UniProtKB/Swiss-Prot annotation:
A Pfam family annotated for this UniProt entry: RlmN_N
PROSITE patterns recorded: RADICAL_SAM (PS51918)
Protein's name in the database: Probable dual-specificity RNA methyltransferase RlmN
Principal location listed in the UniProt entry: cytoplasm
Residues given in the record as [4Fe-4S] cluster binding sites: C120, C124, C127
Function: Specifically methylates position 2 of adenine 2503 in 23S rRNA and position 2 of adenine 37 in tRNAs.
Binding residues annotated for S-adenosyl-L-methionine, in chain numbering: G172, E173, S204, S227, L228, H229, N305
Miscellaneous note of the record: Reaction proceeds by a ping-pong mechanism involving intermediate methylation of a conserved cysteine residue.
Known EC number: 2.1.1.192
Domain Radical SAM core residue range list: 106-344
Catalysed reactions listed for this entry: adenosine(2503) in 23S rRNA + 2 reduced [2Fe-2S]-[ferredoxin] + 2 S-adenosyl-L-methionine = 2-methyladenosine(2503) in 23S rRNA + 5'-deoxyadenosine + L-methionine + 2 oxidized [2Fe-2S]-[ferredoxin] + S-adenosyl-L-homocysteine; adenosine(37) in tRNA + 2 reduced [2Fe-2S]-[ferredoxin] + 2 S-adenosyl-L-methionine = 2-methyladenosine(37) in tRNA + 5'-deoxyadenosine + L-methionine + 2 oxidized [2Fe-2S]-[ferredoxin] + S-adenosyl-L-homocysteine
Name of the encoding gene: rlmN
GO cellular-component term (any): cytoplasm
Organism: Streptococcus agalactiae serotype V (strain ATCC BAA-611 / 2603 V/R)
Names of the cofactor(s): [4Fe-4S] cluster
Length: 368
């Protein structure tokens, strides 16, 4: 059964149970194994939002489900739709805390970026996600619920669109919430549930080297991305506090272990900050840094979304990005400049949540 986490006490979401845990719970409460399979089917294939909609489940067992669980624990607070089809959601958790989820329309399908923590303690100096420190982890049910509510949003439109890809790149450090994230990955990848292919799922870490090694041994065939953002220790430590604990030597040793163990490619995320990490010399350093794993690595150059609280940073001009890209390509680095999404809404990760919390505080002051 689910282990206790630092999540506050309230009725848990049934999404927090893996299929095996749901089977065990049903048997423990006097039902056959197939009953759990029926419930799983209602949750992930028919995608009901209430136990009362499960028409082939007895009223007594539905009452037991209602007594012990909720289906979806999230409340939709705000939805912002961009002209390019990007949708940003602000969800409220049962304890009143807020999280963000983003739906991006890609040429290959609908991709959802999920949040794994309320706030973030990694402390990257350019990032909106860390403006509010970590308050708690999300449990795996709260992470799964984000996917289910986004899918419900599209189900209600009746166009037959389905979430096909997941990126675990929202607020928080996924590997700082390792157990819940791993259960989430196995739930959404389950062939009897949402059945989102492992190669359609990407987990991004800021560089917790020991967790990268652990993840290599889990047998999950999802994609791994590393938020790199600088090609040397001095620069990386100045903009990403995590580098002081896991410097590049330790990080790249873990990445090499991951590649050797899984034979999977690693993507490096690199935000382009004007005059900070975007010189041709920085590009050459990056090419040299990744040379040993070039065949199984990829660099994603990311245009910076300005954050008012971090006004010391600005976006690299297009010509600087192109010059950086050219140096990488000349060195044989597989790289791309990321396509932007949702630039006409609160685009930066964590920005919608931060702005909403500011407005809520201002309203509270006015009401005093």
């Amino acid at each position: 059964m689910p282990k206790k986490t630092d999540t506050p006490a309230y009725k848990p979401s049934i999404y927090s149970l893996t299929r095996d845990e749901l089977i065990a719970w049903a048997i423990e409460h006097g039902e056959k194994k197939f009953r759990a399979s029926q419930i799983w089917d209602w949750l992930y294939k028919k995608r009901v939002q209430s136990f009362d909609e499960m028409t082939n489940i007895s009223k007594d067992f539905i009452a037991l489900l209602n007594e012990n669980f909720v289906v979806n624990p999230l409340k939709q607070r705000i939805v912002q739709e961009s002209a390019d089809g990007t949708v940003k959601y602000l969800f409220e958790l049962p304890d009143g805390m807020l999280i963000e989820t983003v739906l991006m329309r890609q040429h290959y399908g609908l991709s959802v970026c999920v949040t794994t923590q309320v706030g973030c303690n990694i402390g990257c100096t350019f990032c909106a996600s860390g403006l509010i420190k970590k308050q708690r982890d999300l449990n795996n049910g709260e992470i799964t619920a984000q996917i289910m509510l986004v899918q419900k949003y599209f189900d209600e439109r009746g166009q037959g669109e389905r979430v096909s890809h997941i990126v675990v790149m929202g607020i928080g450090e996924p590997f700082d919430n390792y157990t819940n994230v791993l259960k989430f990955l196995r739930t959404v990848n389950d062939d009897n549930g949402l059945a989102i292919g492992a190669r359609h799922i990407t987990v991004s870490t800021s560089g917790l080297a020991h967790k990268i090694r652990e993840f290599a041994n889990e047998g999950v065939q999802v994609n791994l991305a590393v938020s790199l953002h600088a090609p040397n220790n001095d620069l990386r430590s100045s903009i990403m506090r995590i580098n002081r604990s896991f410097p590049l030597e330790k990080l790249f040793a873990a990445i090499e272990y991951y590649i050797e163990t899984t034979n999977r490619r690693v993507t490096f995320e690199y935000i382009m900050l004007n005059g900070v990490n975007d010189t041709p010399e920085n590009a050459q350093e990056l090419a040299d840094l990744t040379k040993k794993i070039r065949k199984l690595s990829y660099v994603n150059l990311i245009p910076y979304n300005p954050v008012s609280e971090h006004d010391q940073y600005s976006r690299s001009p297009k010509e600087r990005v192109e010059a950086f890209y050219d140096v990488l390509k000349k060195n044989g680095v597989n790289c791309v400049v990321r396509q932007e999404h949702g630039t006409d809404i609160d685009a930066a990760c964590g920005q919608l949540r931060s702005n909403t919390m500011k407005r809520d505080r201002q309203k509270a002051k006015v009401g005093q």
